[in-house]
A protein has these predicted regions:
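C-terminal regions of mature proteins
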Residues: 2-122, 128-132, 146, 230, ...
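C-terminal structural cap/anchor segments
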Residues: 187-252
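Generic hydrophobic alpha-helical scaffold/packing signal
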Residues: 161, 170, 174, 206, ...
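A generic structural motif
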Residues: 87-91, 148, 196-202
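Active/ligand-binding-proximal structured segments within catalytic/core domains
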Residues: 1, 152-163
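Short acidic (Asp/Glu) and glycine-rich catalytic loops that position anionic groups and cofactors
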Residues: 43-49, 76-80, 134-141, 150-153, ...
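Extended hydrophobic-aromatic, low-complexity segments
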Residues: 94-95, 151-153, 170-172, 181-184, ...
C-alpha cells in the first residue's frame, strides 16, 4: 500500500510541474461550480492528504485501511449501478452473458446493505488564489459560470474560442506579452474560463482578459473571414473518435443529461454564427470577468509582487 501511495505522490508532483495549466484550471473551476469543486477534491486538494499518508504511514496505516474498506463497500455494489459498453451489436449478447457473474457478485456483496445517493455540501464562492511554486512562468486563469449569471451557452461560444485563441489572445498575450499561448474553456455546465500558459506576466494578462468584452464589442469580420472561423471550429468539433472515445463521450453526455436535440441546436448555432452573434457575447463575458474568480499558478516572487490581487497565497509542494 505504501508503495502505491508513494507512486501516487510522485505522479501528483510530476503533474504539478508538467501540467500546471490544468492544476490552475481545476482550482479555478472549484470556485465556479459544484461539479468543479467535486472534481478538484481529487486534484491539488488531495496532495496534502497523500503527502501526510506517505510521511506518517506507520502511524496511520490501520485507520487508513479501515477507511479503504468502507469506501470499497460503497463502491463495489449493484445499487445505483449504471454500466456503459461500446461494442459491435452482434457481440452484445455474449458480453451480457460474460458480465452476469460480476453483476451477481456485486449484488451479493451489497445484499441487505442500503447505499444512499450522496448530495455533498461543497462550498462554491468567488475566490482569488495564487498557487506559489518555483516555476519561472505563470499560468493565469479567470472565469465564471454563465448560467448562474443568467446567460445561455450557445454554439457561438465555440466560434469565440477559435477567435480568441488565434486572434485576440494570440496578439495580446503571445505576441505582445511573450507567453507561450492562451486559450478558453467552455463546457456544457456553463463554466467559462480563460487561461494563459508559460506566461512571463500576471497583472498584464488579467487586464487582457478583462478587456475581452471591449474587443468583442468592436469586432469586425467579412463573410469570408467568418466562414474561415466556423470551418476552423468545425474541424475540432467533428474530429473522428475511436470506439473508446465514443463510449466515454456517450456516458459523459448521459450523466449530464444532454440530449441529441440540444447538441444539434448548438451545432446549428455554431454553423450560422454571425459577426453580430459574436458582438452579443460581450455582456456575458464582461459579467464573467467582473465575478473576479481568479487562480494563478506561478513563481512565488512574481506572485508576492502582485499579492494585492489575491485573497489567498498557497505554496504548492511546500
Amino acid at each position: 500500500i505504501l508503495e502505491l501511495l508513494q507512486q501516487d505522490r510522485s505522479e501528483m508532483e510530476l503533474n504539478m510541474l508538467q501540467s500546471s495549466v490544468q492544476v490552475a484550471l481545476a482550482r479555478l473551476n472549484s470556485f465556479i461550480s459544484k461539479a468543479g469543486a467535486y472534481n478538484e477534491i481529487g486534484e491539488l486538494s488531495l496532495y496534502p492528504v497523500v503527502k501526510k499518508l506517505t510521511d506518517e504511514f506507520e502511524e496511520n496505516v490501520e485507520d487508513f485501511c479501515s477507511k479503504l474498506q468502507q469506501v470499497g463497500e460503497l463502491l463495489f455494489n449493484s445499487q445505483n449501478l449504471v454500466m456503459g459498453v461500446t461494442i459491435e451489436e452482434g457481440l452484445y449478447s455474449k458480453f451480457a452473458q460474460e458480465i452476469t457473474p460480476l453483476l451477481e457478485t456485486l449484488a451479493e456483496a451489497s445484499a441487505n446493505k442500503s447505499v444512499q445517493l450522496q448530495d455533498y455540501v461543497l462550498p462554491v464562492e468567488n475566490q482569488q488564489e495564487a498557487l506559489m511554486s518555483s516555476s519561472q512562468v505563470q499560468y493565469v486563469a479567470k472565469g465564471a459560470n454563465l448560467y448562474k449569471l443568467g446567460y445561455e451557452m450557445t454554439g457561438a461560444y465555440q466560434v469565440l474560442d477559435m477567435l480568441l485563441r488565434y486572434e485576440y489572445f494570440w496578439v495580446k498575450i503571445r505576441v505582445q506579452g511573450g507567453a507561450y499561448g492562451a486559450m478558453t474553456r467552455f463546457n456544457l455546465d456553463g463554466d467559462m474560463m480563460f487561461v494563459s500558459y508559460r506566461d512571463p506576466n500576471l497583472a498584464e494578462t488579467i487586464k487582457v482578459f478583462d478587456e475581452t468584452a471591449d474587443f468583442l464589442r468592436g469586432f469586425e469580420a467579412s463573410d469570408r473571414e467568418m466562414t474561415k472561423y466556423i470551418i476552423g471550429t468545425m474541424s475540432g468539433v467533428d474530429t473522428p473518435m475511436t470506439p473508446r472515445l465514443l463510449g466515454n463521450n456517450a456516458q459523459r453526455l448521459y450523466f449530464r443529461g444532454v440530449t441529441y436535440e440540444e447538441r444539434q441546436k448548438r451545432r446549428q448555432q455554431l454553423l450560422h454564427t454571425t459577426v453580430e452573434d459574436i458582438r452579443n457575447l460581450a455582456p456575458a463575458i464582461e459579467a464573467c470577468m467582473e465575478e473576479n474568480n481568479l487562480c494563478v499558478f506561478g513563481n512565488a516572487g512574481v506572485i508576492k509582487a502582485n499579492e494585492g490581487l489575491f485573497q489567498k497565497l498557497t505554496p504548492v509542494m511546500d
